[in-house]
């Protein structure tokens, strides 16, 4: 008798788990196209997840980097962009542990007409991005860091080669 009850409860739990999995798959498929940032083409070309945002008519290529704490805009392009300087300076630590003080700006960017507002550290990335330009012909303008992903609840899906919002 108890064995039968445990068996029935187990079947019910498995059915509920299966229903939740199916529901999650359906929800994932309903993410609006504007909320899906594809990086398939750039991954094929450069082996890096790069997404093109816009500010007005200007296209801006950003490397998606969840390992970077903050978003960064290349210092060499900042004067061409609309931005609001923050009232503070912050520190940035390079891969080798070197510490530098950098300006911080607030910028509006769009992806397929969806607006995003974020804080960007202003840092000279010419040397790093110059290698990408000469090797792959891709001109990078900045890095989208984990602060952006957390703020806008974006996840990266390497199976689908997209970043998508779970909001």
How should these model regions be labeled?
Residues 1-167:
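Pepsin/retropepsin-fold aspartyl endopeptidases
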């Amino acid at each position: 008798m108890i064995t039968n009850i445990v068996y029935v409860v187990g079947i019910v739990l498995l059915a509920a788990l299966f229903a939740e999995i199916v529901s999650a798959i359906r929800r994932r498929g309903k993410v609006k196209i504007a909320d899906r940032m594809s990086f398939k083409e750039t991954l094929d070309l450069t082996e890096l997840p790069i997404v093109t945002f816009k500010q007005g008519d200007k296209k801006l290529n950003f490397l998606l980097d969840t390992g970077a704490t903050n978003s960064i805009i290349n210092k060499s392009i900042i004067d061409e962009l609309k931005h609001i300087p923050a009232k503070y300076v912050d520190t940035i630590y390079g891969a080798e542990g070197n510490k530098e003080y950098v300006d911080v700006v607030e910028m509006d960017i769009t992806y397929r007409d969806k607006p995003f507002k974020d804080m960007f550290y202003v840092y000279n990335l010419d040397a790093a991005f110059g290698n990408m330009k000469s090797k792959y012909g891709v001109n990078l303008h900045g890095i989208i860091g984990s602060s952006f992903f957390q703020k806008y609840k974006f996840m990266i899906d390497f199976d689908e080669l997209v970043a998508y919002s779970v909001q």
